[in-house]
Structure formats: structure tokens, C-alpha cells
């Protein structure tokens, strides 16, 4: 089932999006949905923490993240609706049979979020996030764009204004600086013996 089919099954637009915190792919998924549904509430969530309070009655989207099955089932029971968009194999192995869960390991959370919310192909920014998140590194200047993106805060308006060539330029400088630091640190390395081996 495609993300677009999942969207067509949604009873109403989302009122609350929960996305993986401190992660470009998680925020990219939230940004993708925000581009279509700017009036929803967007909350970052972290692994190892329980879901936020006051989820009852919301039309919830959970992107690039999922909770344990009992937690998801409890959320689904109280929510007006729930959709889970994820690409992690561990979550898919335990949640794939849930009618509100959609998984695709060949796509990033950001691209899944875009495909769920939009009919047109994902924009360049999300394709680059996917290239890094899936460790493909197939797009030109992908490492540069990834380095530049990591230097910015997670802000919807800011991300909307990114330009590809500018991120490439910034990323080249960041990678050059990182490589120089590594070279300097490596020049001070000394061999030591550890448990009889060098």
C-alpha cells in the first residue's frame, strides 16, 4: 500500500504530528507534512520516553518513529485517527499488521511524509535527506548538503528557504574544516600497547 493510499484512507487532516526528535529525517518528515498542513501541531518525540499527554481526540500522524505495539494500540484507541509512517525494520517486524501503520524500508521518513501529504514527487531537500539516511550517498554533493543541513536548527520557515547551491557551498567549507581538524588530531597520535598488542 502506498503512502498516498494511506492518506486517502485518513478521515480528516492531521491535527497533531509526532516526529522523531533531533533527527534530520524525522524533522524532514514533519516539514513535509507541515508544507500541506501548517495548522496541525508538531511535537518532537524521543526513543525511551512515553508519548506526550493529551492525545485523545486528535487526528495523529506519527512519522519516522513508532512506539511499542501496546502503546500504539492505546493511542489508536483514544485518538480520532492514527497513521504511522516509518521505515525502520525493527518497527515493521512488530507493527506491520496494524491497519494504520505503513512501512517502506527503501524510503526515508522524510520522503514517506512527503508522499503521504502530497501528490507530486519529493523536493530536492528531502531526496538528499533520504540519500544520507539510507546511506546511499548517490546524489551529487550529498555529503556537502548533509554537513550544511546539520549546522542549522530544525525550523520550518528556515528549511522552506534553503537553496541547494547555497547548502552545497556551505557544506564544502564545513567538510574542509572537519578534514583539517582530523588531520591535525591525527598528526598528534601515538601508538600505544594495549594488552600486548600495538
Go through each PLM region and give its residues.
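A charged, amphipathic alpha-helical module
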Residues: 152-198
Amino acid at each position: 500500500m502506498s503512502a498516498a493510499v494511506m492518506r486517502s484512507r485518513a478521515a480528516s487532516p492531521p491535527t497533531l504530528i509526532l516526529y522523531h526528535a533531533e533527527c534530520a529525517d524525522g524533522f524532514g518528515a514533519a516539514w513535509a507534512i507541515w508544507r500541506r498542513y501548517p495548522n496541525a501541531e508538531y511535537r518532537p518525540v524521543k526513543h525511551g520516553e512515553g508519548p506526550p499527554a493529551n492525545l485523545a481526540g486528535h487526528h495523529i500522524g506519527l512519522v519516522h518513529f513508532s512506539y511499542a505495539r501496546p502503546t500504539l494500540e492505546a493511542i489508536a484507541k483514544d485518538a480520532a485517527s492514527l497513521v504511522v509512517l516509518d521505515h525502520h525494520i525493527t518497527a515493521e517486524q512488530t507493527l506491520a499488521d496494524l491497519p494504520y501503520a505503513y512501512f517502506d524500508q527503501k524510503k526515508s521518513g522524510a520522503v514517506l511524509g512527503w508522499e503521504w501529504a502530497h501528490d507530486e514527487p519529493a523536493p530536492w531537500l528531502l531526496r538528499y535527506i533520504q540519500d544520507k539516511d539510507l546511506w546511499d550517498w548517490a546524489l551529487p554533493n550529498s555529503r556537502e548538503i548533509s554537513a550544511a543541513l546539520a549546522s542549522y536548527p530544525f525550523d520550518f520557515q528556515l528549511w522552506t528557504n534553503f537553496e541547494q547551491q547555497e547548502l552545497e557551498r556551505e557544506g564544502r567549507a564545513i567538510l574542509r574544516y572537519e578534514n583539517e581538524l582530523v588531520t591535525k588530531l591525527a598528526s598528534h597520535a601515538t601508538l600505544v600497547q594495549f594488552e600486548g598488542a600495538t
